[in-house]
Amino acid sequence: MLQLLGLSTAVFATRTQAAVRPSRSATAGPLAAFPTTGRPFEPLLGPIPLPSDGLDASAQRSVYGRVNLRDDMVVPRGYRSDVLLQWGDPLGSARFGFNNDYLAFTSLEGGRALLTVNFEYISPRPWCAGYKEVMGRELPFARLKELLASRGGSVNALVLEMDDPLRQPLLAVASAALEDVGIGVAEITLEQQGWQRRSGRFDRRLSGLTGLSRPQEQLRSTGPAAAVFRRRQRLGYDDGLSDRVIGTFANCAGGQTPWGTVLSAEENFQTHVVEPVYADGSSPPPAQRPFHFDGERLEGLGNPFGLSGNKYGWVVEIDPRRPERTAVKHTALGRFRHEAVAVRARAGEPLVLYSGCDRHGGHLYRYVSEAVVRDPGDQANSRLLERGRLEVARFQPDGSGRWIPLQPQTPVEPLLPSHFEAFELPAVLPVPHSDRSQAGAELLRSDAHQRDYRQRFRTLADLYPGSGEEQLGAILIDAHLAANAAGATPTARPEDTELDPRTGDLLITFTAGGSDGEGQADPAIFRGPAGETSWPYGWLMRLQDDGAGNPEPGGTFRWRLVATGGTPWQGGMGFANPDNLAVDRAGNVWMVTDRASVNGSADVFGNNSCWLFPAAGPAAGEPLLFATGPMECELTGPCFDQSESTLFLSVQHPGEDNATHQQGQEEIQAYSLMDRDGGRFEQLRLVPLGSNWPAGRAGQIPRPGVVAIRRQDGAPLLMR
């Protein structure tokens, strides 16, 4: 636990806490929370026994024998949770979007503030079920589904004739979906009863279609890839926009800069546009990512509008205090499935950013600016995001590591397939296709294949021919495959990156090990408590960047895994699939989880949740359950107001699997658990299907939203 707090490098002994809030029976109310034992609040009880729950084995078997999950935002005794914003609320000239994720708090004068909010993606079931009620107009979902089914479920919308009966319903649904994602800025005010939503002049929406009908609102792009966008001769598709971009979507997490801007991370863009690129960085045509809708999946939203895939998957900078300022995609930071951004800005040093690529086998990246920071608060620092060096992490099993620059002269030396085979795992090593007239990847199947590949391509320049910014831009557009070719470590879905203000360490959440056919986490680095090579419950890592103050190419770092997900009887700490982080001024680490709603063995952990790792006191380093979310949702985007008396959280996709909960729509699940003495016992769990949050009444549609959590007495969030 001391390692988690950055206080020791000794071997970390995993301990555990909880994940959801149980009740004494399938119909009873919630249990009282843990007795206070010097903890900063009374932690919630979860659905599984924990060493820290204060119960002996007999009591654990009694308490956890029958449990019901709650379709509610549950917080500890003495706290309250208030809905601040929800899907469909007016926001500027538009609406508060769907599936809000990352939140950034910007203080203004006079008790006013701004919340910058990401709207990540569309969950078709609850979105279709609630759209008419929320937006006040109907979309032709049934007609679209019927027409598409007759054509195999997918279509290249760009070739539809004007009088095709499919065209209008398709454009109506695709437009509405892209308008419901992107970024928003909402003004709030501090009243006696806490933070309240108040419309203001800073209210703003960017969507997936911003700039389509009003070209003056198109996003700018900076950095080397902008040179690729401007090329007139290319191997692939030309959208005719040069270095301008239509909209932003797949906005997951992000980061804030000391000069007042917000960085929004485009993550799973591959759902809607073509991800692979040619050797020159250009994209295949949108026809390769056709539009699809069947009521369960909604994909290829970029296809009807001819969006070029190489313009998505970037970090977007927005100034919430200047709505007239154009949003910018900074391509020097690389194109991959960005989850979040951590920013280190110190006077006299280069600007350093850290970001993870959230995919199985994704990498951890570091960006180092070419020039140095003069004043961290100077708005001119945005220019430091335009020229710099993108690097990718290579981890070693001994706890060391180094940064590999993604530059033309970087040697091609991908991992050997035998590295994975030694752990009895199949190698999933995609690298840029050896036929450089083709877009995308090929898999290295054997060590001999790897050696032949290296003989043919000595450096990244051999894979990405050209010169100058255009060559570097192509590498950055294809950052994930270029990183694989350069020998970066494939990791376990790296999600959030946050800097510890006390130690300077980088905190990284890795959501899950294993493979999905696209990539495989390195089993020499990411192992379960008993050495498992495909551990699905995730980790929290601390990374000490040795040259953070003066980062050189090929610099080194030290790393250690300091918290492991999983059940206590498996050696885990009681949570599953860590996702977003927030670190308060006292160094307490707040963490939310991203357990898929239907995830096999992970279902034992119940609803997704928010945890606290205290930095000091009797519970230092111990995960304490602070909140659980409604049914089938994630809690995301934790952030604080300036006094740290309010925690803001996004409640994303409630009812994602079953949409609206109806009276009596529950199922009973059975689990085999283990008490503190190692005795097995059975649990029956009542699980509502679907959600009615935030209305709280059966039959009411679920709506994603933002909550403000504070103490009922108005004191700081944590007791000192």
Could you tell me what each predicted segment is?
Residues M1:
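Glycine-rich phosphate-binding loop of nucleotide-binding enzymes
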Residues L4-R720:
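Conserved small-residue
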